[in-house]
From Swiss-Prot:
PANTHER family: ENDOPOLYGALACTURONASE D-RELATED (PTHR31884:SF9), POLYGALACTURONASE (PTHR31884). Transmembrane segments: none annotated. This is Probable endopolygalacturonase D. Glycans are attached at residues 240, 322, 366, 429, 490. It comes from Emericella nidulans (strain FGSC A4 / ATCC 38163 / CBS 112.46 / NRRL 194 / M139). PbH1 repeats lie at residues 280-302, 303-341, 342-363, 364-384, 393-414, 422-444, 456-500. It is an enzyme of class 3 (hydrolase). It catalyses: (1,4-alpha-D-galacturonosyl)n+m + H2O = (1,4-alpha-D-galacturonosyl)n + (1,4-alpha-D-galacturonosyl)m. The lineage of its organism: Eukaryota, Fungi, Dikarya, Ascomycota, Pezizomycotina. Gene3D superfamilies: Single-stranded right-handed beta-helix, Pectin lyase-like. Disulfide bonds join 173-188, 358-374, 483-488, 506-513.
Length: 514
């Protein structure tokens, strides 16, 4: 029977939680040993509303280094809390409401925090398991799941029953060895990559997938060391695709082999983009669990009608310094989703734990980012804009999202001395907590090495709405707007209230900061 598995013991893999049986993970251990006591404060302790660890027992504070992010993450890994008392939990994995799925089960799944895809355990389609050899057969019909990607703004759903994806009816091939991937791509319409290890300098190349193909990651996908900034570990292209994972899978980017606190700004060579989606059309990427990527995670470019949903990105292992990072967090430039030159894209219902932009859009049109949970990074960003082959962003909505324990909340950044256009941007219903630098920031003096303090006006920024953006700062400025001469126009603020910062500065609009 095909079923939706929603069991709490699976959370450590789904969220890349620490092993409570490992003595090195004292925070996870105390939650496991004293789960009842933990549940009593986890019911109300969420990073979306807590900026100080008040009410947390001393033993938990000691084991978790008094860090809100560690406490909150461990609460998430503990499992579901009482819905009668809990505040809203981070965004969870859900299929877009407009995307039909195939189901053969009449069982009702119990809602949980991490609903996940479970591939078919039996099928009338041919099933071929192989290492380096496969049998070919005709592909089945294209997946209606993938073909139904929509540009309509999705409805936010934080926890709901989930129907597993059961394949597209064509040949299914299970790959357990890297050498078998290319043959499967050429011959199969359903491809399961099970516990695949990609050797050094070996890309998981999914650029020639059949139209309507499905790729399902199972077990643990791992990679050898490749010290090359031009190397992309996973590359995906195609039309009407479904890219997803089983309930217990994890894709591990081996970031610890590269992290040196410098990311792509220097230090050792490291893969600059972990997963590249390019020339992907009318497709769905759903329910992937990814951890420990070296630098940028998703590089999404030249796509059309693409939906990404239910994705958990966890790079929190890079928060701590290592021997190479000179006291700084080991991971750096660890953007979650970088989007460029894409049209009609939906990113929703996903969690990002990282050290840089949760989402960064540098070019594209008609993009919706909804129901995100962003922790530890640089917030929800437009930019940086300027100095690239495509420098136009038009029609972006960020909505119904939480940004916690991060450097920035809502950010628009344009490069000093460059040209481009940013228009029709909306931030609505965004909750901020523990923001250390800027709650809302628009700056036109940005450079990767540091802002110049002198804004330029080569990039126009017009028709920007901030609606119901609320929350608290742990320091820094609530608002910072630094526009070039005449380059900002028609900014509106409604229901905006950010507190806890100081020395706000806004040279636009004329009325000053909100």
């Amino acid at each position: 029977m095909k079923r939706c598995a929603l069991l709490t013991p699976l959370l450590p893999l789904a969220l890349a939680c620490n092993n409570p049986n490992d003595p090195a993970h004292s925070c996870a251990s105390i939650y496991s040993v004293s789960s009842d006591e933990a549940a009593s404060f986890c019911a109300t302790f969420t990073a979306s509303v807590v900026s100080e660890p008040t009410g947390v027992p001393d033993a938990f504070l000691s084991a978790c280094d008094s860090k809100i992010k560690h406490l909150s993450s461990a609460c998430s890994c503990l499992g579901p809390v009482d819905s009668a008392t809990a505040t809203p939990v981070p965004a969870t994995s859900t299929v877009p409401a407009s995307v039909p799925v195939i189901t053969t089960s009449t069982a009702t799944a119990t809602p949980s925090r991490i609903p996940v895809f479970v591939p078919s355990s039996s099928s009338s389609s041919a099933v071929v398991t192989f290492k380096t050899q496969i049998k070919s057969s005709s592909p089945g019909p294209s997946s209606s799941f993938a073909a139904a990607a929509t540009t309509e703004a999705p409805t936010s759903t934080r926890a709901s029953p989930y129907t597993p994806y059961t394949g597209n009816g064509g040949t299914t091939c299970t790959v357990t060895d890297y050498a078998g991937i290319s043959s499967a791509v050429a011959s199969c319409s359903n491809i399961m990559l099970s516990d695949v290890y990609a050797p050094p300098s070996s890309t998981i190349d999914l650029q020639d997938l059949q139209t309507g193909a499905a790729v399902i990651f199972a077990g643990k996908t791992t990679f050898g060391d490749t010290s090359d900034s031009d190397f992309d570990p996973i590359v995906i292209s195609g039309t009407n695709l479904t890219i997803t994972g089983t309930e217990d899978h994890v894709i591990d980017g081996n970031g610890q082999a590269y992290w040196d606190g410098q990311g792509s700004n220097g230090g050792s060579d490291k893969p600059d983009h972990f997963i590249v989606l390019k020339h992907v059309y009318n497709s769905v990427v759903a329910n992937l669990n990814i951890q420990n990527w070296p630098v940028h995670c998703f590089d999404i470019e030249n796509t059309e009608s693409l939906t990404l949903t239910g994705i958990t990105l966890d790079n929190s292992a890079g928060d701590e310094p290592n021997d190479s990072s000179d006291g700084d967090p080991a991971a750096h430039n660890s953007d979650g989703f970088d989007i460029k030159s894409s049209t009609d894209l939906i990113l929703k219902d996903s969690n990002v734990y990282n050290q840089d932009d949760c989402v960064a859009i540098t070019s594209g049109t008609n993009i919706t980012v909804d129901n995100m949970y962003c922790s530890g990074g640089h917030g929800l960003s437009i930019g940086s804009i300027g100095g690239k082959s495509d420098n136009t962003v038009d029609g972006v909505v960020f909505s119904n999202s939480q940004v916690v324990n991060s450097q920035n909340g809502c950010r628009i950044k344009t490069n000093e001395g460059e040209t481009g256009e940013v228009s029709n941007i909306k931030y609505e219903n965004i909750s901020l907590s523990g923001i250390s630098k800027y709650g809302i920031v628009v700056q036109q003096d940005y450079l990767n090495g540091g802002p110049t303090g002198e804004p330029s006006n080569g990039v126009s920024i017009t028709n920007v709405e901030f609606t119901d953006v609320t929350g608290t700062m742990s320091g820094g400025k609530d608002y910072y707007i630094l526009c070039g001469d005449g380059s900002c126009e028609n900014f509106t603020f409604s229901g905006v209230s950010i507190t806890g910062g100081s020395d706000d500065s806004c040279n636009y609009p004329d009325s000053g900061c909100p």
